[in-house]
Amino acid sequence: MEVQPREIRRYTTAEGRAPFTEWLDALRDRNVRVRIKSRLDRVEQGNLGDFKSVGQGVFELRINYGPGYRLYFGQVGLTIVVILIAGDKSTQEHDIRQAIEYWTDYEKRESTDK
């Protein structure tokens, strides 16, 4: 099976906010930021690792470290991954709902831009 490299994009709201970037920048633990960025590097190389669908086109990428970090993303075709939002196990339900809202918004705005 051939590995498919992926381009990572970060979701931005209509108001110009980047929820994932804001979350990542707010992390105080530098080691956590390094682990998350390393995980995203592997995604770019085509290795999604531990992930699952959470519904409506949104996927959860799990990072088994600390409180159980999760990154939520949508995928455009086979090669583009759009990082929507992130959190940990304690905020999982809220984060999934928010990620689905962001993904719906992303798809809606992308379809009107064409």
What are these regions (language model features)?
Residues 70-74:
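Short, surface-exposed beta-strand/loop micro-motifs that present aromatic residues
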Residues 1-67, 77-81, 88-114:
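Basic, Lys/Arg-enriched alpha-helical interface segments
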